[in-house]
A protein has these predicted regions:
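A conserved acidic beta->alpha catalytic loop
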Residues: 45-54, 74
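Cell-envelope/extracellular polymer assembly enzymes that use nucleotide-activated donors
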Residues: 9-12, 40, 195
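N-proximal low-complexity "stem/linker" segments adjacent to membrane-targeting elements
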Residues: 1-32
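Short aromatic/hydrophobic "clamp" motif used to bind/position activated sugar donors
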Residues: 92
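Donor-binding/catalytic cores of nucleotide-activated saccharide
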Residues: 76, 80, 97-211, 215-233
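Short alpha-helix within the catalytic core of nucleotide-sugar-dependent glycosyltransferases
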Residues: 25-29, 53-57, 89, 102-114
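Membrane-interface aromatic/basic loop that binds lipid-linked glycans or pyrophosphate carriers
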Residues: 3, 118, 279-367
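Catalytic core of nucleotide-sugar-dependent glycosyltransferases
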Residues: 212-221, 227-254, 271-303
Length: 367
């Protein structure tokens, strides 16, 4: 398939790489085997100290489409921005170096974008484990009934609430460039896809979602905590950038109603992101993180950027308890991070009462 007559490739595939020799062959094998042949594969080596650069060079020798940006370590956001500056395909795709794509992934994503004139297309993916035995589980972000048709993604908060998964999508490069959509280049940071994803969903005129699973998202190392002090507040930095972008940049080009809507959406999804980040933290950082979370949401509520009623009942009760007294919440919720569904239900009963638990259970059943 080739849709670009300008001499540039149909798609630029960006692969950020740092010390991932164990998985890199499988990743690059899936990239060069794509049924969409008219692509460039840009490997951004972020100062790897293992054999990753040598593996990239192996593929460069075998396939002229493979290129490398070889640079000192500067973090994920800066690596991605360097790749975006080098890319010259009509579309941009992203592949994490420990994941791998289905052979027809890029062809399906680009074809859907072309048919619908979409600024981006996004698909489902598989959670993948290689040990103790190989298994996969579909991460169904999109139900079949919602797929294959153009949508305006900023119409509903549900779209913003999806897992960012920037790598199960392709984006029109001119859309990203025209809107100056880039990654937050904080050195050593984690969770650097939140602000990128928010801007994409807020600014896209048209998107298309696909039910197909296009990628295997490796889970073998998912159990690791955030143990580095300089990574504790990375998610806060992402949402600070989202807030800055809305109140400064969007205020110049959007109506006051749209700005208010985006602020509300940002705070609703921020709650989910913060709780997910909290669960992954080393426990010694819980108190510090909760104090900042409470301060931020208290400020947002006082500024009328959103209301607690914008959240589902169990989330509303939980956030109110954190905002009211984060240290009391921590003292009474020591097992929250590791709790299963029953443990969470008991927690929500304590902070919100039986009605909140009923809503939580019904939501779980509906899923």
């Amino acid at each position: 398939m080739s849709t670009n007559s300008s001499g540039s490739p149909v798609l630029s595939l960006l692969i950020p790489i740092y010390n991932v020799e164990r998985y890199l062959h499988e990743c690059l094998d899936s990239a060069v085997a794509q049924t969409l042949k008219d692509i460039e594969i840009i490997c951004i080596n972020d100062g790897s100290t293992d054999s990753s650069p040598d593996i990239i060079r192996e593929y460069m020798e075998r396939d002229a489409r493979v290129k490398m940006i070889d640079k000192a370590n500067s973090g994920y956001g800066d690596s991605m921005n360097r790749g975006l500056e080098m890319a010259y395909g009509k579309y941009v795709g992203i592949l994490e170096s420990d994941d791998f794509m289905a052979p027809d992934a890029l062809e399906k994503l680009v074809a859907a974008a072309e048919r619908n004139g979409a600024d981006f297309t996004k698909a489902n993916f598989d959670l993948y484990w290689s040990k103790p035995e190989e298994r996969r589980e579909l991460m169904e972000l999109f139900k079949a009934k919602d797929c294959g048709k153009p949508v305006h993604p900023s119409d509903t908060v549900d779209a913003f609430s999806l897992k960012p998964s920037i790598w199960s999508a392709v984006y029109r490069r001119d859309f990203l460039n025209r809107n100056a959509i880039r990654f937050l280049p904080t050195p050593g940071a984690a969770f650097q896809d939140a602000s990128f994803t928010f801007k994409v969903f807020a600014l896209a005129d048209t998107a298309v979602f696909l039910h197909d699973s296009v990628l295997s998202y490796r889970q073998d190392n998912e159990g690791s905590s955030v143990n580095s002090p300089n990574k504790v507040h990375c998610v806060n930095d992402e949402y600070a950038e989202i807030h800055r972008w809305i109140v400064e940049d969007c205020a110049e080009s959007h109506s006051s109603q749209d700005v208010a809507k985006l602020l509300r959406f940002a705070n609703v999804i921020k709650y989910d992101s913060y709780m997910w980040s909290y669960i992954r933290l080393n426990p010694k950082y819980y108190a510090e993180f909760l104090n900042r979370m409470a301060q931020e949401f208290r400020g947002a509520l006082e500024a009328h950027e959103f209301e607690l009623t914008d959240l589902k009942p169990w989330k509303r009760a939980n956030l109110k308890a954190i905002v009211d007294d984060p240290q009391k919440w921590l003292a009474e919720s020591s097992g929250f991070a590791s709790a299963g569904a029953m443990g969470r239900a008991k927690h929500y009963a304590r902070v919100g009462g039986p009605g909140v638990v009923v809503a939580f259970v019904l939501n779980a059943i509906k899923k």
